[in-house]
């Protein structure tokens, strides 16, 4: 595959779709593979879209084919160029490059209009003037057949004239539409004379004010696939019944053969998250989150800001696979992918999130120590650690009294400082409320990189940061946004927001992190994996987001 088509190698597992493609190529039904990723630009992409992106681009890569990026932009009321830009950015960030220029369904509006006229001329479409309420009533239910519209038997000439009036803006919104003439008694509601065109007086981000009639998704999607010569149109299971309409439209218009075929796979249902764009938008507009890229959001941009890497999301999509069975994927499976990625690749650093001051009384002069940036990757080099008389440790790493299971600093006992010396807690200083403000210690200068010479055992190791050579930092500790496993089932999502989904703390990091780069993941030793916030963080305002805990099951 050429670099101009795809830039990322994706390992795909065999699945029912690859089996179908293998059969199509072997039989000569197709001699190439052409897929597409067709989002509607009415919101930011989420983790479910990542699965579709990896599937469509991954299959194109595996079969040395092509994959288009096409915006299904048929509803100008909900769409915006902001979403177009974000979608392009997300696809590229995940590591993919589409074939040629991005496509738009609106590129085909003239052709779609022509095919609509063809259906009218064949007696397969008519202009209906039922109100939306009447249309719902006439449509019937799953157990009751629909009934024909009183406008269904208009002549071809009358329908052509009325459709032209629709195009010319002579009907108000909701007063007329073009419907396919199929079967109002069909057991599949989607086939009960579905709407093909409706009137909308709205400015379109691509076509401006050229049109006041816009085609419906089901009419547009299949024709766009055929125009682009897509061989395998991959959709999620909720479009399974729509395949009948997909095939009906293509079989009844004069478009080049062979026709594309639609195949459905299960959508991604991730435990504890929402993928409804409407509900995600509600979180944004209600101020529950600070935007589509809030690190608690399941959007690709939110996961990116939180510190997820493209490789981790691609690996997650590979692991969950492609099936026809709906299931719920545990959130831990997603976390495992980023945890493994960062464990292997993230440089190490130390951060004290809940600081308490320590004075090492027998330190005479500051000393520069060396620490590896990664214990298993010597090629990543070393960093300088200033060891000073005053340091900070985490308040959870000290107790005045403790049992043998507590392997940290205890009054009168020793512990090792990470990448440094053994220290001993001698006494403490408290404020008027009894809170410890300072721990006074001594250190053994002969223990750098080795055990005490007299053979005494020091079991615990704690992290630390110099109190005089550091950088102040804010730490944003993210937990699940919802306190229920299936927030999508809730009527009022605001009622199930986890009040502890964001905990903000202030502390200190190594002075080296003054040069932290946005989206660079770090393992803050004994704390978790963090990255510099890409929206608000900077060298002068260090804000680190918790990407994932060091171990599964941790919550702040």
UniProtKB/Swiss-Prot annotation:
GO terms for biological process: glutaminyl-tRNA aminoacylation; glutamyl-tRNA aminoacylation. Gene3D superfamilies: Glutamyl-trna Synthetase, Domain 2, Glutamyl-tRNA Synthetase, Domain 3, HUPs, Ribosomal Protein L25, Chain P. Keywords: Aminoacyl-tRNA synthetase, ATP-binding, Cytoplasm, Ligase, Nucleotide-binding, Protein biosynthesis. The keyword Zinc does not apply. Its EC number is 6.1.1.18. GO terms for cellular component: cytosol. ATP binds at residues 40-42, 46-52, 236, 267-268. InterPro entries: aa-tRNA-synth_I_CS, Gln-tRNA-synth, Gln/Glu-tRNA_Ligase, Gln_tRNA_ligase_bac, Glu/Gln-tRNA-synth, Glu/Gln-tRNA-synth_Ib_cat-dom, Glu/Gln-tRNA-synth_Ib_codon-bd, Glu_tRNA_lig_a-bdl. GO terms for molecular function: ATP binding; glutamine-tRNA ligase activity. Pfam families: tRNA-synt_1c, tRNA-synt_1c_C, tRNA-synt_1c_C2. It catalyses: tRNA(Gln) + L-glutamine + ATP = L-glutaminyl-tRNA(Gln) + AMP + diphosphate. The keyword Cell inner membrane does not apply. Coiled coil: none annotated. CDD domains: GlnRS_core (cd00807). A motif ('KMSKS' region) lies at residues 274-278. L-glutamine binds at residues 72, 217. HAMAP family: Gln_tRNA_synth. NCBIfam families: glnS, PRK14703.1. This is Glutamine--tRNA ligase. It comes from Haemophilus ducreyi (strain 35000HP / ATCC 700724). The lineage of its organism: Bacteria, Pseudomonadati, Pseudomonadota, Gammaproteobacteria, Pasteurellales.
């Amino acid at each position: 595959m050429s670099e101009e088509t795809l830039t990322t190698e994706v390992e795909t597992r065999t699945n029912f779709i690859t089996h179908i493609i293998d059969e199509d190529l072997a039989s000569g039904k197709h001699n190439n593979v052409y897929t597409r990723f067709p989002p509607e630009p009415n919101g930011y992409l989420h983790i479910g879209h990542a699965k579709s992106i990896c599937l469509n681009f991954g299959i194109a890569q595996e079969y040395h084919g092509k994959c288009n990026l096409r915006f299904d932009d048929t509803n100008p009321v909900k769409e915006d160029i902001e979403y177009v830009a974000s979608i392009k950015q997300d696809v590229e960030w995940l590591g993919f490059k589409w074939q040629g220029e991005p496509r738009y369904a609106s590129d085909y509006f003239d052709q779609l209009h022509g095919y609509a006229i063809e259906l009218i001329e064949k007696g397969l479409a008519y202009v209906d003037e039922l109100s939306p309420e009447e249309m719902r009533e006439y449509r019937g239910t799953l157990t009751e057949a629909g009934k024909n519209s009183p406008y269904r038997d208009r002549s071809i000439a009358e329908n052509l004239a009325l459709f032209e009036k629709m195009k010319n803006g002579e009907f108000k919104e909701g007063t007329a539409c073009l419907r396919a003439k199929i079967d109002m008694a069909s057991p599949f509601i989607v086939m009960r004379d579905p709407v093909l065109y409706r009137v909308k007086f709205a400015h379109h981000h691509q076509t401006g004010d050229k049109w006041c009639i816009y085609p419906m998704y089901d009419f547009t999607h299949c024709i766009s696939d055929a125009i682009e010569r897509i061989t395998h149109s991959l959709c999620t299971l909720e479009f399974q019944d729509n395949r009948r309409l997909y095939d009906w439209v293509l079989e009844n218009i004069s478009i080049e053969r062979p026709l594309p075929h639609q195949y459905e796979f299960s959508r991604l249902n991730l435990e504890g998250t929402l993928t409804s764009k409407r509900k995600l938008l509600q979180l944004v507009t209600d101020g529950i989150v600070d935007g589509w890229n809030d690190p608690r959001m399941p959007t690709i941009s939110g996961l990116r800001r939180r510190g997820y890497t493209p490789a981790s999301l691609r690996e997650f999509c590979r692991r969950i696979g492609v099936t026809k069975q709906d299931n719920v994927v545990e959130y831990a499976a997603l976390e495992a992918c980023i945890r493994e990625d960062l464990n292997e690749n993230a440089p190490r650093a130390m951060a004290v999130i809940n600081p308490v001051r320590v004075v090492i009384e027998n330190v005479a002069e500051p000393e520069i120590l060396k620490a590896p940036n990664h214990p298993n990757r010597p090629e990543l080099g070393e960093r300088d650690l200033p060891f000073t008389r005053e340091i900070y440790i985490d308040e959870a790493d000290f107790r005045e009294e403790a049992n043998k299971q507590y392997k940290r600093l205890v009054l009168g006992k020793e512990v090792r400082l990470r990448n440094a010396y053994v220290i001993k807690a001698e006494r403490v200083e408290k404020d008027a409320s009894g809170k410890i403000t300072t721990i006074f210690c001594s250190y053994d200068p002969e223990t750098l990189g080795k055990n005490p010479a007299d053979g005494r055992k020091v079991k615990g190791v704690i992290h630390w940061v110099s109190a005089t050579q550091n950088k102040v930092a804010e730490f944003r500790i993210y937990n699940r946004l919802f306190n229920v496993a299936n927030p999508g089932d809730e009527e009022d999502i605001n009622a199930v927001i986890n009040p502890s989904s964001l905990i903000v703390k202030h502390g200190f990091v190594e002075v080296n992190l003054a040069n932290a780069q946005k989206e660079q993941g770090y393992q803050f030793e004994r704390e978790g994996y963090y990255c510099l916030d890409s929206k608000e963080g900077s060298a002068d305002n260090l804000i680190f987001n918790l990407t994932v805990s060091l171990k599964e099951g941790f919550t702040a």
